[in-house]
Amino acid sequence: MQRDYLIRVETESMLDFKRLNGLMIGFVIKGEAHIYDENNMTQCNSGDIFIINHRDLYRFQLQQDGIICYIQFQMKYLADKFDDVHCLYFHLTDATTTKNIHQLRNIMARLVSTHIRHNELSKLTEQQLVIQLLMHMIHYVPRTYHSNQSILNDDKVNQVCDYIELHFHEDLSLSELSEYVGWSESHLSKKFAESLGVGFQHFLNTTRIEHAKLDLTYTDETITDIALQNGFSSAASFARTFKHFTHQTPKQYRGDRPAITENQQSAQHNYHDRELILLLNDYIEEMNHFIEDIEKVNYKEITFQPTNHQLNQFNHIIQVGYLRNLLNTQYQSQLLTCHSDFQVNEVLAYDVMPYIMKKLNAPFTYDAEISNIFYDIDLCLDFLLDHNFSLTMHLNQYDSRDYIDAFKVFIHHVALHVSHRKDLKFNLYVTTLHNSLIEMIDYFKALFPNGGLYVHLDQATERHLPLLKRLEPHIDHFVFDANSNDAVDFNKMNDDEFKTASQMIINKTNYLIDLMHRHHLKRPLILLNWNTLTGDTFITNGEYFRGGIIIEQLLKLSSKVEGIGYWLNYDLHVSHCKNERDYMNSIELFHQYNGKRPVYFTALLFNKLTSNILYSDDTCIVTGTDSNFQILLYDAKHFNPYLALDNQMNMRATEMIHLNINALEEGIYKIKHFTLDKENGALFNLWRKHHTIHGMDKDSIDYVNRMSFPKLEVYDIDVTDTLALNIKMITNGIHLIEVKRYPSS
């Protein structure tokens, strides 16, 4: 219930002191706040925690743009949770370690953020986090016993006040309370007035009215119900007492505070919910949960139905920059790993003609009898031939005679080098069209009749349509680029803009398909340079986990695009970029030290799907047969990547999916469950934790690479008719479940 605890965000100062009934803990979200008690003032800056104990006088004074948040526990709630509430007097001291302070702030930030977001299961998640917060305080924040913290003149009067706070909803009397402390009624009444300046009945009614105000503000309960549950004998008695203390009737008081909901109460002043979430992100850190923070439950029933649709796997094209990079043994190993895991068989290299022209025009002459100007190129070709990779070369600035001559020398040499071995699958890729290309392609096709020509396709290509038509018989594929980051302004928080960006890749694909149709061009497409929303910095690109978004794009593209491009690794990729924004145009498979990025595992998991589709919807696809099938579930949420700048982003949501696969043949099934999400397989978090100003040593590198893998669970399950699976889906996560029935014995 709301009356058990309050979760608030405050942007305005308190004018007067209040005496707290209960326990309050909070921290400064932004700016500076002065926390006053009866005798002292404590200056708190951003991130500082404050605690106010039961019966303390307190007041907040917020400096300009200051924001604080707090959780206030009612005494009755604490009494229900703890055997002895007198032990709940907390004090932050040097004994409270920085780690524990961070953890307290972490829990509170998540709690306030959950409260603001107000999702389907926010109330349950709040209650879990509240318990976690109290447990952490009990274990890690120093406490003193109540008897050392008396704020009144007499301990017995203090006991009576505590008793009233815990039992105000009951039928209390002065005689009952005097018996409780062993005094006469007259003596208790006298001591009460001396200590508090008010009589017993006045104090009791004040306590009841304060609790009733909370119910009037935050619940829809009837006034009669509120009266009875706060200790009044009737609605009429409640109304009289309420008006005496507030000069308003309960109905008038409630009417002055319309439409205050649990999620609105935290968003005060001129701060939007999302701004508060973004500010709270700075205080949320990764932590091991002993409480599940499930925010949504989804039930999915699947029965396989025959379909005419097939899932097409992609031809993966890996960019390596300069051809000589293939001499690097680490890069060779990475390519072979890709080839083994998801059938990579094509390498795209930059133009070698400038390199050859430089050698051909050198001031000294290479003697063919004692040297070979193509020595390093031949070693690269041998690696490709040995491992059945095809080579695609990006030609650039090929409109000069010197370039064409160098091209012919190079192509002739390659043809001679591979003539005594199996054929090399050789392709040329051009991004601009020039008439000199006709001569070059004719020469190339004469020596490599099975060679391919890739042509970049965009709006500008239409200006060269006649030349494109002449080249069409030689063209194998059209190539294009698409970057969702180009569609948004990351300084804005407009959700509609990010929704538009989520469709950018598929929209451009459809546009090009329509362009080809209008001009009667029929060739398969290759998406070479592409990216989903990542932000425009290296940090957002790493922190914003987007595995599910990438899977979503691959599924949408599988029937429209034949090839998908990636850079091999971070070092090769970044060395060919002008700036961070340019870097965001593409995705690489490896980080440094052979660390596999999540996109690597996304491609690996996608490759485990087979062609026959048994079921599909917006977040799930099942392929295979009824006895050997693959279930792919994913979450794809597109939002501003800057909201993900935290190890455990505040836009993170957790969904429990109860999945039933119906009408299966009875038997024992083997389950292999891969989980790729922010907590399983995300390289960037581990990398940053183990990276020092001097880099990483071998132990750290090996550990990070071992731990940065999808989670794998393997088990057998006996199925009669329905296979039931429970899947915890984190924002933008992926679950690939392979199911195979054992043969009958």
From Swiss-Prot:
DNA-binding region location: 175-196, 223-246
A single GO molecular function term of this UniProt record: sequence-specific DNA binding
InterPro entries per record: Glycoside_hydrolase_SF, Homeodomain-like_sf, HTH-like, HTH_AraC, Tscrpt_reg_AraC-type_HTH
Keyword list, A-Z: DNA-binding, Repeat, Transcription, Transcription regulation
Domain HTH araC/xylS-type: 158-256
This protein's record includes keyword Transcription: yes
SMART domains named among the record's database cross-references: HTH_ARAC
Gene3D superfamilies: Glycosidases, Glycosyl hydrolase domain, family 39, Homeodomain-like
Domain of life: Bacteria
Record Pfam families: HTH_18 (PF12833)
Family matches, as PANTHER family: ARAC-FAMILY TRANSCRIPTIONAL REGULATOR, HTH-TYPE TRANSCRIPTIONAL ACTIVATOR RHAS
Protein name (Swiss-Prot/TrEMBL): Uncharacterized HTH-type transcriptional regulator SAR0107
Source organism: Staphylococcus aureus (strain MRSA252)
